Amino acid sequence: MTRFLKKIHLYAYFTAVLFFFLLGYPFLFYYARTPQKYYRKLVLFRRWISLAGIYVVGIRIHVEYETPIDWSQNYVLCANHTSILDITVLNYLCKSPFSFMGKIELLKNPITRIFFQTIDIPVKRDSKISAFKAYKRALELLQKEKSLAIFPEGKIDDDYPPMLHPFKSGAFRIASENRTTILPVVIQDAWQILWDDGKTYGSKPGIIHVKVLAPISSDAERDKASPSLEAEVYHKMKKAWNIYNK
């Protein structure tokens, strides 16, 4: 597929997402007025918009589970980050209500803004005050038995093809303080469909392969999020990533 066609495909994808967002906007506007009451509705619309957008342009998701997942409990979902499609992957994957924690710049995006003003958690990483507020919101969310999705690398890799980079500790401190199980998610090849925001290489139809590893407990023995928890999650995700991305 030529770069020109990939650019056309990218514009088609963005157009599809915008179309479904505008289609659902009257409902979103209403639900956003009282997000605590309509949390599940907002999560549902976020999922519907993102999945409808990829289906229209021929992108599919295939998930392989290392062990069966009990979606009746909440998790801290830790996923690698190589593409804006990673958000859609987690919307597809998580069967229970959850919030994203993401960079504050997502408040500038006309589509993600309404979600990061209501159900998702924006954080300005270079601000200690913003980071603390986001941390407290995340703990409150988990205490309400909702799940939280975090990309522990902190950003999409600047290099192509991408690698799995060392994790930041935030996700593991949050999980340990609330003793919430971590669910490692390895998104193997979203970057081959659409790397980063697509501006460099465009996008194309295809299947995104995802490996969900066995949940990892952050029990009482790990109250302070010892480096061993972070290292264990990273090692297992790195191993799964390397098997697919040789």
Segments the model singles out, each with a brief description of its role:
Residues 4-5, 133-246:
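Non-catalytic C-terminal accessory region of glycerolipid acyltransferases
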Residues 25-33, 40-43, 56, 71-128:
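Catalytic core of membrane glycerolipid acyltransferases/transacylases, capturing the structured
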Residues 63, 121-125, 218:
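Short acidic-hydrophobic, aromatic-tinged amphipathic segments that line or gate anion-handling sites
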Residues 63, 77, 100, 210-212:
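Generic preference for hydrophobic
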Residues 56-64, 131-132, 192-195:
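Short gly/ser/thr-rich secondary-structure transition/capping motifs
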Residues 2-62, 114-118:
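A transmembrane-helix-recognition feature enriched in membrane-embedded lipid enzymes
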Residues 66-70:
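Glycine-rich helix-loop-beta junction characteristic of Rossmann-like nucleotide cofactor-binding loops
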